[in-house]
A protein has these predicted regions:
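Sec-dependent signal peptide hydrophobic core
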Residues: 5-13
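Structured beta-strand-rich core segments of catalytic domains in phosphoester-bond hydrolases
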Residues: 37-38, 62-134, 224-231
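Metal-dependent phosphoester-hydrolase catalytic domains
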Residues: 114-115, 145-149, 157-167, 173-249
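Active-site-proximal beta-strand elements of phosphoester/diester hydrolases
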Residues: 22-34, 113, 128-142
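N-terminal, active-site-proximal structural segment of metallo-dependent hydrolase catalytic domains
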Residues: 2-6, 18-81, 93-97, 153, ...
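N-terminal post-signal-peptidase region of extra-cytosolic proteins
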Residues: 37-45, 87-89, 195-201
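Active-site beta-strand/loop signature of hydrolases that rely on acidic residues for catalysis
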Residues: 23-30, 45-69, 136-139, 154-182, ...
Length: 249
């Protein structure tokens, strides 16, 4: 499976137009690198990420120096194992450290900011990172539909003056036909195939993980390749991959 995935991605990258801006995006709720077998395994998660050769990755459910993960900064481990640059945002204090989300990227961000998101059962957050050719947002949304709806105008407000292509990815905790997703669709184009389910990893029966392109500032997105990676063990979610070509204004 890994060889076939690598060859498919390589084919897309080789035959894309040379002048086109193309971005290989992954969204992955890594469940703090605890697999369906209850085993902590950072290398296993890193291997899943690396086999897709991503330009950028949105990660959810990361411990940072907590008692639970024996003082390890999970994103730092994944940085070392993948060779990508990490950007971390704590959502809540947890067991002497924190718990949050992150980005892994080939480029170091020019700058980034962290914006609190609604979350009545647990505080949530959004990372907005600017790169040379695009802006990337990573998030893990609330379990509560009311919070998810409240988050949409906050996201839109944060992005309304950005004049680069914008992507957003994460575990949105909502179904494709839900009210929060319909509200997001007023501002974002969904790039992944929502009929390919992402959760739970061993027997997926729903799509709650998404990759989007922002549709309000004149850029268009041509999906070259998209896939839910068929990994049943590394996390409780399956990772979502999209290779997209950006078309200018």
């Amino acid at each position: 499976m890994k060889r076939n995935l690598f060859l498919s991605v390589l084919f897309v990258l080789m035959f894309a137009p040379a002048h086109a801006q193309q971005v290989n995006i992954l969204s992955y709720n890594v469940h703090n690198c605890i697999g369906m077998d209850k085993e902590y395994n950072y290398r296993r998660i890193a291997n899943v990420i690396s086999q897709t050769s991503p330009d950028i990755v949105a990660l959810q459910e990361l411990d940072s120096v907590t008692v639970r993960n024996k003082g390890i900064h999970a994103l730092g481990e994944l940085e070392k194992l993948t060779g990508l640059h990490g950007t971390y945002a704590a959502a809540i204090p947890f067991q002497g450290g924190s718990y949050g989300i992150g980005i892994l990227s080939r480029e170091i961000p020019i700058k980034y900011k962290i914006i609190p998101m609604p979350g009545r059962e647990e505080k949530r957050t959004l990372i907005i990172a600017e790169f040379k050719d695009y802006v990337f947002c990573a998030t893990h949304q609330s379990l509560t539909p009311e919070d998810q709806l409240l988050a949409v105008p906050l996201i839109e407000k944060a992005l309304q003056n950005v004049d680069k292509p914008i992507f957003m990815a994460g575990d949105m905790n909502s179904a494709p036909a839900s009210a929060p997703q319909l509200e997001l669709a007023k501002h974002f184009a969904t790039l992944n195939d929502t009929t390919s389910y992402t959760f739970p990893a061993d027997r997926p029966n729903r799509c709650i993980d998404y990759i989007y392109g922002y549709s309000k500032n004149g850029y268009r997105f041509d999906v070259q390749y998209r896939k839910v990676i068929e990994d049943t063990i590394s996390s409780d979610h399956r990772p979502v991959q999209v290779i997209v070509q950006v078309k200018g204004k």
